[in-house]
C-alpha cells in the first residue's frame, strides 16, 4: 500500500497543480495583431520606388508583416507620359494585388501619383481601397513656376504656359494634364483631357459611373502644407484653388464640391475625409518625414 501511494502521489500532485500551471510557466510572447491590409505606393513626377525606402522602413517598424508594394512604373522621365496612359499601366499592376486582398488595401500616392490614384478609383468598378492617402498631391491642379516646369518649358512662364498646355501637343505631357490656369478657365475646361474629367467639370458619358466608383473608397486622407514649395497653391493638396483673382478658395467653396460632381461633398458628409496639414515640410521630404508619418499616415493603415 505505501508503495502504491508513492506511485500515485505524483499524479495527485499534478492534478492539484494544474490550475496554477499558467503562473508557473514562462509567458508566451503576445501574438501580432491580425494581419494588416496590404499597402500600395504610387510615386510622383521624376520619382522611382527607391525614393520611398524610408517610408517602407516606417511601415515595417510600426506595422510588422504588412505587405508593401512600391510600384516601379513610369519612373524618371517616363513619368511625363500622359496620365491616362499611366493610369492604365498602374491599373494593370494593382488589380492582382487587390484580388489577393479580399479585406481591402491602402493606397499611398505622392504628388502627381495622387492624381493617378484618384483616376484609378474613378475608373475601377470593383476596387477595394480602404484608405486613399493623398500625399502632397495637386488634386485641384497646379499653377506655379517650378524647377520642373522651367526644365521642361524653359521659355514659358506660368502666365503663358496655357498656350502650350491647352494644345493637343501639350496634353501629351503629364504636367499639362493638371495645369489649371485660373485666368483661362474656359480653355482649361475645353482642353484638359484629364483633370477636368476626373473632377466632373466637363460632361462625359462615364461621369456617373466614375463618381459611384470613387465613393467606394473607405477614407480619403489629404496631406500637404504651406512650406511645400512645389504644389501651387499648396491648398490644392486639400482641393482648394485660386479663383480668377488668385484668391484661394477652400474645398467647401469650390464648384466641384458644391455640385458634388465626383463625390467630395458626400465623402465629407459621411466623415470620410481626413485633412492633415503640416508646416515645415518641403515637397521632396514628405515621404521621409517620420513626424509626418506618425501623425498623418500610420493611424490610417489598419
From Swiss-Prot:
The active site is at 111 (nucleophile), 228, 283. Keywords: Disulfide bond, Glycoprotein, Hydrolase, Lysosome, Signal. Transmembrane segments: none annotated. Its EC number is 3.1.2.2. Catalyzes the cleavage of thioester bonds from S-palmitoyl-CoA or S-palmitoyl-N-acetylcysteamine (unbranched structures) but does not have activity against palmitoylcysteine or palmitoylated proteins, branched structures or bulky head groups. Conversely, hydrolyzes both long and short chain fatty acyl-CoA substrate. Pfam families: Palm_thioest. It catalyses: hexadecanoyl-CoA + H2O = hexadecanoate + CoA + H(+); S-hexadecanoyl-N-acetylcysteamine + H2O = N-acetylcysteamine + hexadecanoate + H(+). It is found in: Lysosome. InterPro entries: AB_hydrolase_fold, Palm_thioest. This is Lysosomal thioesterase PPT2. It comes from Rattus norvegicus (Rat). Belongs to the palmitoyl-protein thioesterase family. Residues 1-27 form the signal peptide. GO terms for molecular function: fatty acyl-CoA hydrolase activity; palmitoyl hydrolase activity; palmitoyl-(protein) hydrolase activity; thiolester hydrolase activity. Disulfide bonds join 109-117, 165-176, 276-296. Its main location: other. Glycans are attached at residues 60, 190, 206, 245, 289. One of its GO terms (cellular component) is lysosome. The gene is Ppt2.
Amino acid at each position: 500500500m505505501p508503495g502504491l501511494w508513492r506511485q500515485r502521489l505524483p499524479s495527485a500532485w499534478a492534478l492539484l497543480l494544474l490550475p496554477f500551471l499558467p503562473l508557473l510557466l514562462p509567458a508566451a510572447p503576445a501574438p501580432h495583431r491580425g494581419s494588416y491590409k496590404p499597402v500600395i505606393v504610387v510615386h510622383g513626377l521624376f520619382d522611382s520606388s527607391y525614393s520611398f525606402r524610408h517610408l517602407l522602413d516606417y511601415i515595417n517598424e510600426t506595422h510588422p508583416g504588412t505587405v508593401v508594394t512600391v510600384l516601379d512604373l513610369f519612373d524618371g522621365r517616363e513619368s511625363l507620359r500622359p496620365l491616362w496612359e499611366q493610369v492604365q499601366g498602374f491599373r494593370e499592376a494593382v488589380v492582382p494585388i487587390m484580388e489577393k486582398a479580399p479585406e481591402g488595401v491602402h493606397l499611398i500616392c505622392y504628388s502627381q501619383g495622387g492624381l493617378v490614384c484618384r483616376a484609378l478609383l474613378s475608373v475601377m468598378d470593383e476596387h477595394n481601397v480602404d484608405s486613399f492617402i493623398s500625399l502632397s498631391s495637386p488634386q485641384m491642379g497646379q499653377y506655379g513656376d517650378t524647377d520642373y516646369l522651367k526644365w521642361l518649358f524653359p521659355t514659358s512662364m506660368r502666365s503663358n504656359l496655357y498656350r502650350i498646355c491647352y494644345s493637343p501637343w501639350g496634353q501629351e505631357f503629364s504636367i499639362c494634364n493638371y495645369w489649371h490656369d485660373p485666368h483661362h478657365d474656359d480653355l482649361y475646361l475645353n482642353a484638359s483631357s484629364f483633370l477636368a474629367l476626373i473632377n466632373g467639370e466637363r460632361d462625359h458619358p462615364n461621369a456617373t459611373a466614375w463618381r459611384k466608383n470613387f465613393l467606394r473608397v473607405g477614407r480619403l486622407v489629404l496631406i500637404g502644407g504651406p512650406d511645400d514649395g512645389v504644389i501651387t497653391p499648396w491648398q490644392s493638396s486639400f482641393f482648394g484653388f485660386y479663383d480668377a483673382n488668385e484668391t484661394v478658395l477652400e474645398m467647401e467653396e469650390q464648384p466641384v464640391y458644391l455640385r458634388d460632381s465626383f463625390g467630395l461633398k458626400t465623402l465629407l458628409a459621411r466623415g470620410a475625409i481626413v485633412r492633415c496639414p503640416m508646416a515645415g515640410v518641403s515637397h521632396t521630404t514628405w515621404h521621409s518625414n517620420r513626424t509626418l508619418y506618425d501623425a498623418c499616415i500610420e493611424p490610417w493603415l489598419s
